[in-house]
Amino acid sequence: MEEMALAQQVPNLGLARFSVQDKSILITGATGSLGRVAARALADAGARLTLAGGNSAGLAELVNGAGIDDAAVVTCRPDSLADAQQMVEAALGRYGRLDGVLVASGSNHVAPITEMAVEDFDAVMDANVRGAWLVCRAAGRVLLEQGQGGSVVLVSSVRGGLGNAAGYSAYCPSKAGTDLLAKTLAAEWGGHGIRVNALAPTVFRSAVTEWMFTDDPKGRATREAMLARIPLRRFAEPEDFVGALIYLLSDASSFYTGQVMYLDGGYTAC
C-alpha cells in the first residue's frame, strides 16, 4: 500500500510529459514551410488544430495531404484585431478551449536601407511584430479567462540578435521585436501559468530562401558563407524544429518561459 501511495505522488518523468494529446493549438502561417511541418507533427502527436493562413488552396492541400481533415480552418492572416479574434474564435468554436499558440506567420523584404521603400519596411514590421502582437492579444484574453495556463510560441530568427549586411534593415529589427515581445509577455503572464517563448532558427529551406539553394552566383556565395559558420555544416530542414515545438507546447517545458531558443546548428556559438 505504501509503495502504491508513493507511486501516485511521484510525477510522471517519462515521455508523457511531452504529450500534446488533445491540446487545442492554433497555428498561424500554417501554409508556410515551418507551419506545414508543425501542423503535420502536432496532428500526428494527437493535438487538436486550428490552422490559419491567407492561402485557401494551401490550407486545403495541407488538410487533405496530412490527413487532418478534422482541423478547424481559418483563411486569413493576422492583419487586424478582427482577423486575430477570428482565429481564436475558430479554435473555441471547434474545441471549446485554447491550450497553445504557434505564431509562424511573417514576412521579409531584402534591400539596402537607402533603396527600401517605407511601405516595404512597414509591411515587414506589420507581419512580424504587429501580427504577432495581435494574435497574442486575442489568444491571451482567452488563456487568462480560462485560468489554466497555456503556451505561446513565436517564430523568430537568429537575426533577432544579429545584424546582416545583406539588406535586412527591416527583418532584423522586426525579429528583435519578436524576441522582446516573447520576453515581455512571459513576464506579464507568468503569474497566470502562461508561458511565452521565441523559437529562433537560422536559414532553412523554404520558398523565401529558395534563391540561396540555386547555382546563381549570389545564392552560391551566400550559401557557402553561411555554411562556413554553421558547425554542423548543413542547413536546417523544417523537420528539424519539430522536437523543439513539441517540447515548448507540452508540459515538459512547464518551467521554461521568456526565452529565445536558438535552433541554428551552432551558428550563434561562433
Swiss-Prot record:
SMART domains registered for this protein in UniProt: PKS_KR
Binding site for substrate: 157
Molecular function per GO: oxidoreductase activity
Binding site for NADP(+): 30-55
Transmembrane segments: none
Active-site positions on this chain: 171 (proton acceptor)
Note: Was identified as a high-confidence drug target.
Annotated Pfam families: adh_short_C2 (PF13561)
Protein name: Uncharacterized oxidoreductase Rv1714
Family label: Belongs to the short-chain dehydrogenases/reductases (SDR) family.
Enzyme class: oxidoreductase
Enzyme Commission code(s) on record: 1.-.-.-
Entry's Gene Ontology cellular component terms: cytosol
Keywords: Oxidoreductase
